Amino acid sequence: MLDVKYLRNHFEEVKEKLLKRGEDLTNIDRFEELDKKRRELIAKAEELKNKRNEVSQQIAVLKREKKDADHLIAEMRDVGDRIKTMDDEIRQVEEELNALLLSIPNIPHESVPVGKSEEDNVEVRKWGEPRSFSFEPKPHWDIAEQLGILDFERAAKVTGSRFVFYKGLGARLERALINFMLDVHIEEFGYQEILPPYLVNRASMTGTGQLPKFEEDAFRIETDDYFLIPTAEVPVTNLHRDEILSAEDLPIYYVAYSACFRAEAGSAGRDTRGLIRQHQFNKVELVKFVKPEDSYDELEKLTNQAERILQLLGLPYRVVCLCTGDLGFSSAKTYDIEVWLPSYGTYREISSCSNFEAFQARRANIRFRREPKAKPEYVHTLNGSGLAIGRTVAAILENYQQEDGTVVIPEVLRPYMGNLEVIR
């Protein structure tokens, strides 16, 4: 959520920056109109309340002097009714203003490249060289089916499309990756592990920016108004909702493994095969709470920490800075890490690392004090995938496949798989 004071004082500047996102300005224009109306209503209501106070004193004097005050009392009843009507109108306007404020995306950081779509994203760096195959590389779903480690067909029977059974060494590879990623982030980078709930309430989804705009992408338990988490970012960020932290506690680094659930409402016909786009998938998530002045340094660190996993796995990747038109709703700046997938002949997203500045903290009311008696300030929040497990499995199967259909297990994962070297 944007700072209301900043928005009021810089409407044109905010509009200009949101236009770079390709944003429709209808909501912000409506906000400006309603905000003006609210101020006018408050001024009129205050004027009436002042009048009521003055006349109340006059009535008290008349009563003390045993004079007739009926005409003033009748007038004040009318004023009281007008004040009540006006207060109700102010309340309605404020509710609409708050709803509009929740629908306005974050302002892009000045360093974000201007563009309309992913075609305008800017490559920052590459790591590793894509492998040259002496045979035609297969897509991961064909490799997995031949090895009997993933079963999409039975998952479709049991549940529906975009689900999968991991079997045997496939399940073991998934579990090995989860433990490996957690160990690296905890032992090498000092993250604290969190195992979060998979169901959250509406306030939590609103706090991180999934609601109200993206409700159609979420799985909702209607009886209790709970939501299945689309990412561990939601429960972990909301861990400190409505709290005031101490500056001494910052930065806070959390790492969480969880299943993630997404309706993928706008993805019909895209990535219909394989592990790239599933309704349920596992992910290791990195979440940071930091001082505002540190957040962009922390974004670089966060991205490097996610990259470290791919480097240890020996998987070629590139880092791209998302342009304004491809930026997520809550993000001020995002780096996507894209892993090389031979069957696609291109890089595909495996991690997204974002700085939300105070956008989420303002929605979730997460603050800190620099000194014990100092005025609370909003923290800056960041998060990134460290990494998406299913897409990492896909990348390993494709990049480490052999001509005979077997798959070599990356060396760093072998201790997690009983020192097994090959999936056959």
Swiss-Prot record:
Its main location: cytoplasm. One of its GO terms (biological process) is seryl-tRNA aminoacylation. L-serine binds at T231, A232, E233, E285, S385. Pathway: Aminoacyl-tRNA biosynthesis; selenocysteinyl-tRNA(Sec) biosynthesis; L-seryl-tRNA(Sec) from L-serine and tRNA(Sec): step 1/1. The keyword Transferase does not apply. GO terms for cellular component: cytoplasm. Its EC number is 6.1.1.11. It catalyses: tRNA(Ser) + L-serine + ATP = L-seryl-tRNA(Ser) + AMP + diphosphate + H(+); tRNA(Sec) + L-serine + ATP = L-seryl-tRNA(Sec) + AMP + diphosphate + H(+). Keywords: Aminoacyl-tRNA synthetase, ATP-binding, Cytoplasm, Ligase, Nucleotide-binding, Protein biosynthesis. GO terms for molecular function: ATP binding; catalytic activity, acting on a protein; serine-tRNA ligase activity; transferase activity. It comes from the Bacteria. Pfam families: Seryl_tRNA_N (PF02403), tRNA-synt_2b (PF00587). ATP binds at R262, A263, E264, E349, I350, S351, S352. PROSITE patterns: AA_TRNA_LIGASE_II. CDD domains: SerRS_core (cd00770). It is found in: Cytoplasm. Consists of two distinct domains, a catalytic core and a N-terminal extension that is involved in tRNA binding. Catalyzes the attachment of serine to tRNA(Ser). Is also able to aminoacylate tRNA(Sec) with serine, to form the misacylated tRNA L-seryl-tRNA(Sec), which will be further converted into selenocysteinyl-tRNA(Sec). Belongs to the class-II aminoacyl-tRNA synthetase family. Type-1 seryl-tRNA synthetase subfamily. Homodimer. The tRNA molecule binds across the dimer. This is Serine--tRNA ligase. The gene is serS.
